Amino acid sequence: MALPEANMSSTRSEQSSRSHDTIVGNEQPHSEKPAASAPGDQMSSDDEDEGPQTEEMIRRHSIVRDLARNYTNTSHHFTGSSADLFNAADANSPLNPSSENFNARAWARAMAKTMGENGSGFRQSGLCFQDMNVFGYGAETDYQKDVGNVWLGLPDMVHQMISPNANKRRIDILRGFDGVINAGEMCVVLGPPGSGCSTFLKSISGETNGIYIDDSTYFNYNGIPAEEMHKSHAGETIYTAEVDIHFPMLSVGDTLTFAARARCPQNLPPGIDHNLYSEHMRDVVMAMYGISHTINTQVGDNYIRGVSGGERKRVTIAEATLSNAPFQCWDNSTRGLDSANAIEFCKTLRLQSELFGQTCAVSIYQAPQTAYDLFDKALVIYEGRQIFFGPADEAKAYFINLGFECPDRQTTPDFLTSMTAPSERVVRPGWENKVPRTPDEFHARWKESQQYQIVRAEIESYKSLYPLNGSSADAFRENKHSAQAKGQRLKSPFTLSYMQQVQLCLWRGFRRLLGSPGVTIFQLIANTAVAFIASSLFYNMKPETGDFFKRGATLFLAVLSNAFASALEILTQYSQRPIVEKQARYAFYHPSAEAFASILVDMPYKITNSILFNVTLYFMTNLNRDAGAFFFFLLVSFIMVLAMSGVFRSIASLSRTLSQAMVPASLLILALVIFAGFVVPVDYMLGWCRWINYLDPVAYGFESLMVNEFSGRNFTCTAFVPNAQIPGYADVGGLNRACSTVGAIPGQSYVNGDAYINLEYKYFHAHKWRNVGILIAMTIFNHVVYIVATEFISAKKSKGEVLVFRRSNMPSKAKSDPEASSSRPIPTTEKNNNEVANIQGSTSVFHWNDVCYDIKIKGEPRRILDHVDGWVKPGTLTALMGVSGAGKTTLLDCLADRISMGVITGEMLVDGKIRDSSFQRRTGYVQQQDLHLETSTVREALTFSALLRQPASTPREEKIAYVDEVIKLLDMQEYADAVVGVLGEGLNVEQRKRLTIGVELAAKPPLLLFVDEPTSGLDSQTSWAILDLLEKLSKAGQSILCTIHQPSAMLFQRFDRLLFLAKGGRTIYFGDIGKNSETLTNYFVKHGSQECPNGENPAEWMLEVIGAAPGSHTDIDWHQTWRDSSEYQAVQTELQRLKAEGSANSVDQKSDPESYREFAAPFGQQLLIATKRVFEQYWRTPSYIYSKAALCIQVGLFLGLVFLNAPLSLRGLQNQMFAIFQMLTVFGQLVQMQMPHFVTQRSLYEVRERPSKTYSWKVFMLSQIIAEIPWNTLMSVFLFVCIYYPVGFNKNAEFAGQTAERGGLMWLLIWQFLIFTCTFAHAAIAITDTAEAGGNLANVVFMMSLFFCGVLAAPDKMPGFWIWMYRVSPFTYLVSAILSTGIANAEVKCAANELTTFNPTNGTTCGEYMDSYIKAAGGYLTNPDATSDCKFCTIKSTNVYLKALSASYDDRWRNFGIGMVYIVVNIVGALFLYWLIRMPKNKNKKKTA
């Protein structure tokens, strides 16, 4: 689909005139080491300072001519026009990205020539940095906050607000960095996690949020100062993080089209428009990264199905590539890619550097040698110290000259990284006392070296060639300005104009809607259904006074439904915030442009929804049947939607975290509802809070709709006093009776609508259009606040990486303590390996034969695994390898019995016997994702696994002692009591991986250990440490099967056996690897492959042999070759032997029943341990507990103060009823707070603990429910105290002499409400995947229950069809019990405006006239002795009011009992629904053994 264009048709003459003087290529001359073949490098080295303008112009013209000539020379293969390049129709053309013959290098040369000839070449920028020091501020306290100790941080918080950095100490991150990266060069940044690689890349690219750069630091970007480059040219230096953040519902093609269009230069070659250019660039980049086939596939994320993880990573890379930034920083961007794709990524960067002069700084973990060889320079960082910077091909020699030795088959990047690991670096004989040991010593040696002096000389040369703000800076600015849209400021970092940005974001917004139309359609259907249900409750109201309350309730419901239809936009804003901020850093668009576009994108939905909902409600309820009134109703309703949308969007944009937004939003919603004027009319609002009504947009909308409905109409009276139906009053008429409705005039049989709303609500016709104007002003103001706040307020950033401890387990010295972190000498003794002696070993052999796995994908059967054979024996370490998509993890899941769908066939045996129900518990499965409970400590996580998964017969003390053994084995002593936390504030990546392995080891798996991708995303040093650990375990007798992603040669050599899979899950090889991989390589050579060259990585060589590496090809069917080989026959023979031996030695399960139980621990112990952990999670999440407490206290106090000392008048009784009604509305907020914590625990349980048979699903559900009860009990006390006494319910009880019982029962009922809420939340979330979906489901049921509980419409006023809903609604019984307990057995005192006025018959007093009536119908007179103007109150006792609502004080305990039954139903329902929806039933799973 073509991208939209706006104001993009600037003429070619305008573009030409503006870009006539633009420098097309790299205008800088050579430094001492020239950039690698960048276009335009062949230039004079006479870079003069700014001189006369004419001389400068002549010089620039000369440069342009030279560069054009240079481009022609380097692009001689392409002689066509620009149209030939962008419209290459030849399917075999190497310039056509859709062609199988597409050649990236040929295209790049042609592109450079085309753009150069038209004076619109590529900007280039190098970097010189000198004396670079980067630091941050770290808090002295790094203990875990919990409910008990969170208050201890308050003094520090106050102090920090006064002086932000006063209570923090400076932590140096990088110290003393110097270097030059010339334009067109590539620099690889090496170092272990935490060494400062990311900080370095962020600093040089301007991503300095949370870190600070010393004032003494010198930056020079080809003459551009750092401040200007990072602000005015932000999109020219970009930082690409390792995380993949995209709109999941957007297709890959649309994602990349957007990126290409956002940075599309305006000065394009003749005949090429912006859409053609953008789509062509998108296709080229997708072809370069091998993702052309995903163009119409959704990107997806962890929850939404889309492209694979590796493809999503390449989408991230492609998006950054399309930014066309001349200076690019890539932070571990190859994470998740195998070595072949990592190499292709680096080759593409090399191509860009050579032909476009782009400069790249790249940090790579486990960099293949081939990738490293593509770089010009290397930077090695050791704990924040620069220990080498210079030519990449000289780095290895530098460290060898320092006295270190590079082992055979170790790659150069691994060798360089090993310099930062004392346990890995190898010292040459005779150099033991000469080599540096600590980071400071390495840094000092670097500063003393000859290489450093060369760097210093290069820096000085660079400074003289590119003086700050010199001619090269001017040329850069001109080139950039020529690419910008017409009218853009030079200092603006954006290519497109603001309106073009809005238009582009608008296009993307509609593409996102098209990507997930189901959500929008479902919302429209759901809202229309709610409209039908609500309308049926007030169906076909008559123009009579008896429906006044229903008519007001209908309009109130309409106002609230329209006003709060946009409440969930808060969640939407936070979900897309990281994406918007990332793309703003790329200078794609202003955040406010996306905000403005999002408002417009939502308009069609808002308009459609508003029409469907309001038309349904208006006509079904029989509101004012006047055309003008109807369209006014639609207008006000729609403006209400927009006004409140602006409010919710503003709240989201003004707060940095979702938790910051939710509590204010909850209170705001409550305040807007109460002060709208229906629940509490204006006259009844207390003075301290009257101002809220003036700021409430809902109030203005409600008043306008009430005036629209009632003004200018007369309503027939349906209730007179005295009533003609009472004997003796049948003939009463005229002035001797009056309508009992507010606004009635004695003698009239109708009530004027204006009089009613004037007296009851203080609403006036003159305010009708005034309020519309106020609403429009509020709408504009709210949206302006939203747009401005979006531009300037960013989301909260993570802190620096720091360990967090329980306060009682804090280490004696803080991490930042200089003494604690002082350098220590390298230990000279080898580590004792005897610690593995106590680790559980395996004695069983696990073997499988002819394993196949078939599954239906989009209705089509697909085979994922195809006749896979193999075994794992005790004491062996077996590698499972294969290309991406070969089914490695799938095979692991099949073998570990973790597949719940599809069809699995084949034999999977343990010592010749079929796997039983205990198999999962008796094996360990180390997953690729490191899933742990954030609030637990390392020791607690290990102990939890040990207590529940080790046999019940093992004493508890022995299990705890075994946990200590595991901690020692994994070298986790230093952080054994640290909290898991989240990345950045807790364990780092390596520590999490060790914990993941430790949790499985703590279970003492007696059979074997499955390990999935243990080194994925880790640096080579950490990967080596993880393999060290696995090797220790195998030597201790463990059987280990491990999938691994293209290991280095040295890592690969550490495995004993290999199972190698090709695409489609077909076996290529299974057998020994052999010394120096000779057994493996000999097999392939024997069957027709080339010899493995010396020094080549066998893991990479295998991929090339089978034709799986990019650019490789083979004519040999290696799967069939394996099936025909003698090695395969030997495997089959061994499998038959294992099966036969196992069957002969089989042991009856009855002899050792405990070993074969599904769960190791009994049910009671499971429940105790699991519940304790949930309690700990809640205690250590003070934000949840205090947010819940704040909500209950603030809502309770707010209601208590708003309805303070509510009188026992008719309106006072209604206010007390609404106080109870509004209290129930905290249901939604409590549910939204609770569900995310449940989802966190459930994710951990379902992904790791349930498949491992740690504890049963019944225990999981019950532990979650039990842990909520004490906290909700505490909250009920807060809510009770804050509402019961301020509102005055206690005074009603005192009047009746029932203080103790009614006070106690009121607390019990409030407690019951909160327990009902939490148990219902568990039932709702049990069947949904996300907290948002669960919250929506719960709110739908809550709204239905609230509608039909008898408050908005009494049961006798409901349509007969809905009586069943009244009876099944749990709130029917709750409201009845609470209201009757609160107000029963008290006398009513009508307010003056509630009294009905009429005259008695001639010659009688009011008392004599009404005596018979009062005896029959109730009520009382305030002036019984008067002979005129009788003042009559229709209700004397609160029990009469209760009866009208079908409530009775006598039913209070019955209703309480019914409420308890609902709670039991919730609990049983939660358990049943979880079992029904989320527990695997294995219906489709078939196995043959």
Swiss-Prot record:
Q: List the glycosylation sites.
A: 7, 70, 73, 118, 332, 469, 714, 1402
What is the membrane topology noted in the UniProt record heading this document? Multi-pass membrane protein
Q: What induces it?
A: Expression is positively regulated by the zearalenone biosynthesis specific transcription factor ZEB2.
- List where in the cell it is found: Cell membrane; Vacuole membrane
The UniProt entry's GO CC annotations, sorted and at most eight, read:
plasma membrane; vacuolar membrane
Composition bias (Acidic residues) maps to: 44-53
Which GO molecular function, any one, fits this protein according to its record? ATP hydrolysis activity
Q: Which Pfam families match?
A: ABC2_membrane, ABC2_membrane_7, ABC_tran, ABC_trans_N, PDR_CDR
Kindly give the SMART domains that the UniProt entry links to this protein: AAA
Organism domain of life: Eukaryota
Question: Residues that bind ATP, according to the entry?
Answer: 882-889
Q: Which GO terms describe its biological process?
A: zearalenone biosynthetic process
Q: Which UniProt keywords apply?
A: ATP-binding, Cell membrane, Glycoprotein, Membrane, Nucleotide-binding, Repeat, Transmembrane, Transmembrane helix, Transport, Vacuole
In the UniProt record for this chain, what is stated about the effect of gene disruption?
Results in the loss of zearalenone production.
Annotated spans, Disordered: 1-55, 811-834
Q: Does the UniProt entry include the keyword tRNA-binding?
A: no
Q: ABC transporter domain location, by residue? A: 152-408, 846-1088
Q: Where is the composition biased (Polar residues)?
A: 819-834
Membrane-crossing residues? 513-533, 552-572, 599-619, 628-648, 662-682, 773-793, 1190-1210, 1218-1238, 1269-1289, 1307-1327, 1333-1353, 1457-1477
Stated role:
ABC transporter involved in zearalenone production.
Family membership noted in the UniProt record: Belongs to the ABC transporter superfamily. ABCG family. PDR (TC 3.A.1.205) subfamily.
What's this protein's name?
A: ZEB2-regulated ABC transporter 1
Record organism: Gibberella zeae (strain ATCC MYA-4620 / CBS 123657 / FGSC 9075 / NRRL 31084 / PH-1) (Wheat head blight fungus)
Upper classification of the source organism reads: Eukaryota, Fungi, Dikarya, Ascomycota, Pezizomycotina
- Underlying gene: ZRA1
